[in-house]
Amino acid sequence: MGIGKSKMDPCHLSVPWGKSQSVDTSQSHHMSDSKQSEEISLHGDAVCSSTAEMPAEEQEGVEERPEEDTEEEVFLKFVILHAEEDTGEALRVQSLLENDFGIKPGIIFAEMPCGRQHLQNLDDAVNGSAWTILLLTENFLRDTWCKFQFYSSLMNSVNRQHKYNSVIPMRPLNNPLPRERTPFALRTINALEEESRGFPTQVERIFQESVYRIQQAIWKETRNTVQRQSVA
């Protein structure tokens, strides 16, 4: 997701334009055209030579600085799928996992890029993260799109071996969906219960770094394969 930037000649960037202009416009010294040209030429040579005498490390810093702005794709720890009305609650849960448990980076579905199809965002969210958290609230089952999200996530975890057990239903503190109203497909999975005393232990058992690393490696290899095929 990053865009590279073109390099520019540091000599051209370093020429003291203020001084060279004063030489051209000043009439008090009545300098000849040849003398002006010689002085400007020496000025430019001095700047370029001073740049050439810089240590290799500093020259690399000057030339490569634009590349530091290049953004790379990041494999997320988790994505939270939620009803539109639960965006605030999803943000709270995201902050809880990231700040209290150190599970980051994560994202909520509402923060996915705008201007793209929902299906593309859903695919990127589920396959671009190690765990998919379904925020089970009263609003979740009222939204047809949410139903599609959790069925798609479950099918993805079944069809892809490395995504097995990656879908995590979670009942938050605020407006949780009662167990008896939870779809059967989700009742077969142990849900995270935020109000439970064992919630911290549940979080530690589920979000293991070793599992994340395995999925991250598979994700990188898949992405590299796709890039090679597109170039070919």
Curated annotation (Swiss-Prot):
Domain TIR: 70-226
Domain of life: Eukaryota
GO terms (BP aspect): cellular response to lipopolysaccharide; defense response to virus; inflammatory response; innate immune response; phagocytosis; positive regulation of canonical NF-kappaB signal transduction; positive regulation of chemokine (C-C motif) ligand 5 production; positive regulation of interleukin-18-mediated signaling pathway
Subcellular location: Cytoplasm; Golgi apparatus; Cell membrane; Endoplasmic reticulum
Phosphotyrosine sites (modified residues): 164
Post-translational modification, as annotated: Myristoylated. Required for membrane association which is critical for its ability to initiate efficient signaling.
Record's GO cellular component terms: cell projection; early endosome; endoplasmic reticulum; endosome; Golgi apparatus; late endosome; phagocytic cup; plasma membrane
PANTHER family listed in its UniProt record: TIR DOMAIN-CONTAINING ADAPTER MOLECULE 1, TIR DOMAIN-CONTAINING ADAPTER MOLECULE 2
Summary of the function given for this chain in its UniProt record: Functions as a sorting adapter in different signaling pathways to facilitate downstream signaling leading to type I interferon induction. In TLR4 signaling, physically bridges TLR4 and TICAM1 and functionally transmits signal to TICAM1 in early endosomes after endocytosis of TLR4. In TLR2 signaling, physically bridges TLR2 and MYD88 and is required for the TLR2-dependent movement of MYD88 to endosomes following ligand engagement. Involved in IL-18 signaling and is proposed to function as a sorting adapter for MYD88 in IL-18 signaling during adaptive immune response.
Binding partners and assembly: Homodimer. Interacts with TLR4, TICAM1, IRF3 and IRF7 in response to LPS. Interacts with IL1R1, IL1RAP, IRAK2, IRAK3 and TRAF6. Interacts with protein kinase-inactive mutants of IRAK1 and IRAK4. Isoform 1 interacts with isoform 2; the interaction occurs in late endosomes and disrupts the interaction between isoform 1 and TICAM1. Interacts with MYD88; the interaction decreases after IL-18 stimulation in a time-dependent manner. Interacts with IL18R1 and IL18RAP. Interacts with TLR2. Interacts with RAB11FIP2.
Protein name: TIR domain-containing adapter molecule 2
